[in-house]
Amino acid sequence: MKSKIEIFTSYIEESNIERIKSMNLLPIFVIRSMGRLEFIEKWAGTPLHFRELAPSKELFREYRAGNIDQVTYFKRFVIELAGVDFQNIILRLENLIDSSGADGICLCGLGENPEESHRSIVSDILWRTGYLEFEPKEV
């Protein structure tokens, strides 16, 4: 049976996180390190922090430094995600929604442009697994 959870994606910025919460969406942080962003560091290491859905630090640094292009970055990130149990990810998300009373979740990553952020890859993979009834959308 397909999951009925609604998944959205968006970027991490303080006012945007507040907007996401006002939509009764649970922010799910898909970044490795949250310590340098004061307004979200309180969620580091909590059930809302899905670091396994973020690029490795090494890969992210290579990309940010300009040592690899976006296509290479995305290809290598997909390879990193090969070991992730996406069915388990969806079960965890469902449990978070059930326990919080939220209407859905929002995968939050860095960068305003979804086409340049790994959150788009994560949401696309979640959709392509066939486990979801509704296609994820950017908000």
Per-region residue spans from a language model:
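Residues lining hydrophobic/aromatic ligand-binding pockets adjacent to catalytic sites
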Residues: K2-V139
